[in-house]
């Protein structure tokens, strides 16, 4: 290693410690083998949690604790340099998890392998914490007063403290007090789930991706897929895309439109005949009503159809206007017919 200082050059004459050379060599091999390197926060992480994760994640990759400077040396050896965004993140108390698994899947795996630990003052209860009835390993002493402070009924039996009945000492979301933490430790309850605090992932040696960009909100994506499914179905119905689901909805609608069009054009078929007869009867009754009003000497009587609810009798003077409007109405144009037929196919 040479360091330029003005016109002088510093040349390292002493060899690097064998331990550091070995660490750099191992890191180099891991970087060559695994495309993804997760960084996780070591601050406040107990050795028990770290060793437990090493054991649980051994099928998915390798957890290594490497000094940032040594990791950067190994990274430069493998990739020929280190991007500024990666160099900025590789500093302080960080650990490394080398893996070939999809980063989004790794986040899920880490969460599923959370490690239980004893509660500490300031922790939040993840659920209602219940101290079960039965014996404890604690001998009578000052600890009994702390049981009493938490309103846990106790008795002394066989030289040990016994819990008289199941007692809730902390509700979900409640902050753990020093008394709660000590009592839970005495009775052997570890209510807190701790996991590696992932910071992000080095993506194939090219860039650093923050953990917030990798967390997938399952419910959000479920809603997006459901919305997309509704839009896709509506589009398929509008363009009459021939699938089983679309045809099951389109064919009955097309049949109804075809029958309505045939009835409007006066085409006689088994389906249109009831509608044509009803329309003919209605038109005949309307015409008879007009004639009866203008020529009462003919003795024409018109029987109007009975309805479920009484309605006002239409004024005779309005019938000629309606008849006149009916006569002025023309049949559908060729463009309307063509448009209706096109909508069916």
Swiss-Prot record:
Ranges annotated as biased composition (Basic and acidic residues): 319-332
Xref: InterPro entries: Ribosomal_protein_uL10 (IPR050323), Ribosomal_uL10 (IPR001790), Ribosomal_uL10-like_insert (IPR040637), Ribosomal_uL10-like_insert_sf (IPR043164), Ribosomal_uL10-like_sf (IPR043141), Ribosomal_uL10_arc (IPR022909)
Gene Ontology CC annotations of this record: cytosolic large ribosomal subunit
Comp. bias regions, Low complexity: 305-318
Protein's GO biological process: cytoplasmic translation
UniProt keyword rRNA-binding, yes or no: yes
UniProt-annotated stretches for the region Disordered: 303-345
PANTHER family, sorted: 60S ACIDIC RIBOSOMAL PROTEIN P0, LARGE RIBOSOMAL SUBUNIT PROTEIN UL10
Subunit composition and interactions: Part of the 50S ribosomal subunit. Forms part of the ribosomal stalk which helps the ribosome interact with GTP-bound translation factors. Forms a heptameric L10(L12)2(L12)2(L12)2 complex, where L10 forms an elongated spine to which the L12 dimers bind in a sequential fashion.
Protein family according to the UniProt entry: Belongs to the universal ribosomal protein uL10 family.
Protein name: Large ribosomal subunit protein uL10
Species this chain originates from: Pyrobaculum aerophilum (strain ATCC 51768 / DSM 7523 / JCM 9630 / CIP 104966 / NBRC 100827 / IM2)
């Amino acid at each position: 290693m040479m360091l330029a200082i003005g016109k002088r050059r510093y040349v390292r004459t002493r060899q690097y410690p064998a331990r550091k050379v070995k660490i750099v060599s191992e890191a180099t091999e891991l970087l060559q083998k695994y495309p993804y390197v997760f960084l996780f926060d070591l601050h406040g992480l107990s050795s028990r949690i770290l060793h437990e994760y090493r054991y649980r994640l051994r099928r998915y990759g390798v957890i290594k604790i490497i000094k940032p400077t040594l990791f950067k040396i190994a990274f430069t050896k493998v990739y020929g340099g280190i991007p500024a965004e990666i160099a900025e993140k590789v500093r302080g108390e960080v650990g490394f998890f080398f893996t070939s698994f999809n980063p989004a899947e790794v986040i899920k795996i880490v969460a599923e392998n959370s490690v239980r630990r004893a509660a500490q003052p300031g922790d939040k209860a993840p659920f209602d914490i219940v101290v079960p009835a039965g014996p404890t390993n604690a001998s009578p002493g000052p600890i009994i007063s702390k049981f009493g402070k938490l309103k846990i009924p106790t008795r002394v039996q066989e030289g040990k403290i016994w819990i008289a009945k199941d007692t809730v000492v902390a509700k979900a979301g409640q902050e753990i007090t020093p008394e709660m933490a000590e009592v839970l430790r005495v009775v052997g309850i570890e209510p807190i789930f701790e996991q590696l605090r992932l910071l992000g992932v080095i993506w194939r040696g090219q860039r650093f991706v923050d953990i917030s960009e990798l967390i997938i909100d399952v419910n959000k994506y479920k809603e997006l897929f459901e919305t997309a499914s509704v839009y896709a179905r509506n589009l398929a119905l509008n363009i009459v895309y021939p699938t089983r689901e679309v045809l099951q909805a389109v064919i009955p609608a097309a049949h109804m439109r075809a029958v309505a069009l045939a009835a409007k054009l006066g085409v006689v078929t088994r389906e249109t005949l009831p509608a044509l007869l009803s329309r003919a009867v209605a038109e005949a009754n309307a015409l008879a009503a007009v004639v009866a009003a203008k020529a009462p000497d003919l003795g024409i009587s018109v029987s109007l159809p009975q309805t479920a609810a009484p309605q006002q009798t239409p004024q005779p003077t309005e019938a000629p206007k309606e008849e006149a409007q009916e006569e002025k109405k023309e049949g559908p144009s060729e463009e309307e017919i063509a448009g209706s037929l096109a909508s069916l196919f």
